[in-house]
C-alpha cells in the first residue's frame, strides 16, 4: 500500500542508503518492518511517547561504560579538572542539558515545530554525517530562541 507515510519512509530509506548512514537506515528499516507486520498501531504510540527518553537512557549508558569498566575513575577526574578544557566541557554539558530540558517539552507539545526539527535532523544525519540527538538539542535551541524573540516582541 502506497500511503504518504510509506512513500516518505521509502524516500528516507533511499537517502540513508545513498548517504551510507547506518543509524538512519536501521531506524527507517525498523519502522518499515513494524508497519509491514501490522504492529504499528500498537507500537508507534509507545515509541513516540517514550522513545526519546529510551534513547537518552541508551546514550547515558554508553557514556557511563568507561566508568563501569574502570577506565575512568576519581584519579582521571581529578587530573581532567586541572585542565580548562574540562571546565569548558563541564559548562557545555550543563548548558546543553538545561537547553534540551525545554526542548523535550517543546517536542512533546508542538507538532508543527517537531516536523521542522525532525526534517532538519534527518537532513543533517543523512547528508552531513550528523548524529540524531539533534531533535532534542534543536528543540531546546528553538525554545531558547523563541523566548528571546518573545522578549523583543512583547
From Swiss-Prot:
InterPro entries given in the database record: UPF0756_TM
A Pfam family that the UniProt record links to this protein: DUF441
Any single Gene Ontology cellular-component annotation: plasma membrane
Location in or out of the cell: Cell membrane
Main subcellular location: membrane
Transmembrane spans: 14-34, 54-74, 87-107, 117-137
Key words of the record: Cell membrane, Membrane, Transmembrane, Transmembrane helix
Coiled-coil positions: none
Signal peptide: none
Membrane topology of this protein: Multi-pass membrane protein
Disulfide bonds: none
Family under the similarity heading: Belongs to the UPF0756 family.
HAMAP family linked: UPF0756
Identification of the protein by name: UPF0756 membrane protein RBAM_026200
Organism: Bacillus velezensis (strain DSM 23117 / BGSC 10A6 / LMG 26770 / FZB42)
Amino acid at each position: 500500500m502506497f500511503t504518504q507515510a510509506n512513500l516518505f519512509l521509502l524516500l528516507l530509506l533511499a537517502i540513508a542508503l545513498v548517504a551510507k548512514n547506518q543509524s538512519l537506515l536501521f531506524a527507517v528499516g525498523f519502522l518499515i518492518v513494524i508497519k509491514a507486520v501490522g504492529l504499528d498501531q500498537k507500537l508507534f504510540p509507545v515509541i513516540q511517547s517514550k522513545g526519546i527518553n529510551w534513547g537518552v537512557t541508551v546514550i547515558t549508558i554508553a557514556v557511563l561504560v568507561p566508568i563501569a569498566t574502570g577506565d575512568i575513575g576519581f584519579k582521571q577526574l581529578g587530573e581532567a579538572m586541572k585542565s580548562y578544557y574540562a571546565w569548558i566541557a563541564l559548562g557545555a554539558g550543563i548548558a546543553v542539558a538545561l537547553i534540551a530540558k525545554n526542548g523535550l517539552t517543546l517536542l512533546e507539545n508542538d507538532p508543527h515545530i517537531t516536523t521542522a526539527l525532525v526534517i532538519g535532523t534527518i537532513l543533517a544525519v543523512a547528508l552531513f554525517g550528523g548524529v540524531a540527538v539533534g531533535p532534542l538539542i534543536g528543540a531546546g535551541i528553538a525554545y531558547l530562541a523563541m523566548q528571546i524573540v518573545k522578549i523583543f516582541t512583547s
